Amino acid sequence: MNYPFWIQNFNRITNYQDKYPLALEIFKHPQSFWYGDNPKKPKKHMEKSIQRLLKRAHPQLPVLVSYNIPNRDVGQYSKGGAKTEERYLDYIERFARGVGDSSPIIIFEPDALPHSTLLSEEDREWRLSLMKQGLEILTDNCNGIVYIDVGHSDWLPAKDVGELLDRISNPKVRGFSVNVCNYRSTDESIKWGKRVCRFRPDDHFVIDTSRNGKGPLESEWCNPIGRGLGEPATTKTKHRVCDAYLWVKIPGESDGKCNGGPKAGMFWGEQAEELVKNRLVC
């Protein structure tokens, strides 16, 4: 896989150069673009936003993230998502129309699959069915390279992940994503991803390396202190089944109101500078 990652070319210097000068290093690297859904916006707002992004990025392509599953984040810091099945499937249809014939990487619903194990049996079956329908709509209506998010290496056994993927995936899905928004090391993530591939031999995977330069702080996942930037985005992973290292989580964006951080998704300059100071030197 040879993928030309796009670095967003807008100028953030005026926002951060005075107070958080070290944070500017983050914006020299390709990052991802997350899409939920805002029912207050016009129906075609997200579709047009994706189309504009793809046009600006051409001939390079960005990494997109669909993040709107009902009961998103199971009520935690990033809670939200579509209110009904109908609204979710409509969101996926509009997302797919936005992508169209382009072929960006698409990370499908971070944490939604492993979070299904926390739900009641009835709610779990409903979520898996909804994800399966969403994936069919997505892969039938756009040319995106789709990876289903499966959590990180310290969450579920590889066999359980394989069984969950069997329930929802389809032949047009490229594979799965590992370590999105987490801090597990690249080596650990590669080993775990390969174990999952034993149960899904046709799959490939990508790893979020945005904040794993120092690895995890024990089991802390919400704004752990002392972490660092990981390997920059690349397709040169030296592992046949690992397609790419990506910065899926935008470094410097908070995990939530924990350990001194602002609400989830807000830029936190102090953390951003800490990540840069502790970055992995390749």
Language-model-detected regions and their locations in the chain:
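Active-site cleft segment of glycoside hydrolase catalytic domains centered on the general acid/base Glu
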Residues: 80-102, 110-144, 158-160
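Structural preference for beta-strand elements that scaffold enzyme active sites
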Residues: 32-33, 59-63, 103-107, 143-147, ...
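Sec-exported extracytoplasmic/periplasmic mature domains
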Residues: 55-58, 97-100, 135-143, 166-170, ...
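Glycoside hydrolase catalytic-domain context in secreted enzymes
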Residues: 67-71, 105, 155
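N-terminal carbohydrate-binding/catalytic regions of secreted carbohydrate-active enzymes
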Residues: 1-98, 250-281
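Surface-exposed substrate-engagement region within the catalytic domains
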Residues: 2-27, 153-273
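Active-site-proximal beta-alpha loop/turn segments in soluble metabolic enzymes
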Residues: 73-78, 110-122, 146-152, 177-183
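Generic structural signal for well-ordered alpha-helices
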Residues: 50-54, 92-96, 131-135, 162, ...
